[in-house]
Design a protein with these regions (language model features):
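Cell-envelope and extracellular/periplasmic
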Residues: 1-217
Length: 217
């Protein structure tokens, strides 16, 4: 299974790794062990631009700094816990402080071009290794820079991205799913229009799209 993680700073990863050993996350001691590589992500690979390599926190998870992490960590932990076989292939395209417009597919904006290119390179590498993916999924973590925008403005642009991913073959498989992450309402960069847009898209096609809110603690 392949999961592409696209978006801005929270997609890059801004959570402190030290928090994995502090309350409330310390209630799950495996988290700190996975972070320290005491427990290893034997069946999780991260794309590094030329190959898929085993995920190691602080080394190749591509957080915003070596002491930070993003959603890749939670996905990897759940994969190791909830599956007994198979490999999870992760790939990121994220930049801090960018608008959704930096992912515009037509004309192709920078993050769209880079993300689509890397996704293609990763696909070529997997094919060369004889790997056949059971499914390809997409996680969208963006909206903070567009918090002041209306639902209509944001929804049109997000739908364009989803349509382009589908028509371009990245998510054409019926098994593909897109997760649209929601900022917690208590955060300073929460945008009601952005949140409503994601909820509307997920509600229109729940078999393909879902919106999930970040936890707050």
């Amino acid at each position: 299974v392949q999961i592409a993680i696209w978006g801005q700073s929270n997609a890059v990863g801004t959570a402190l790794r030290a928090e994995l050993a502090a309350a409330p996350l310390s209630a799950d001691p495996d988290l700190a062990d996975y972070d320290a590589n005491t427990l290893t992500f034997d069946r999780v690979r991260m794309w590094n631009g030329s190959a898929y390599v085993q995920l190691v926190m602080g080394s190749n998870n591509y957080g915003s700094a070596a002491d930070k992490f993003g959603v890749e960590f939670g996905l990897a932990v759940r994969w190791m816990r909830e599956t007994t076989e198979g490999t999870l292939y992760l790939i990121k395209q994220a930049s801090g402080g960018v608008s959704i417009t930096s992912f515009d597919p037509a004309p192709a904006a920078l993050n769209w071009s880079n993300g689509n290119y890397e996704w293609g390179e990763a696909a070529t590498w997997l094919a060369g290794q004889g790997v056949t993916l059971a499914a390809r999924h997409w996680v969208w973590i963006q909206g903070e820079s567009d918090e002041a925008q209306t639902q209509a403005w944001y929804q049109d642009r997000l739908q364009e991205i989803l349509d382009a991913l589908h028509s371009g073959g990245r998510m054409a498989d019926p098994a593909s799913r897109a997760v649209l992450s929601q900022m917690h309402p208590s955060t300073s960069t929460y945008g009601a229009g952005v949140a409503a847009a994601k909820t509307a898209i997920a509600g229109a096609t729940p078999s393909r799209f879902s919106d999930i809110q970040f936890p707050g603690y």
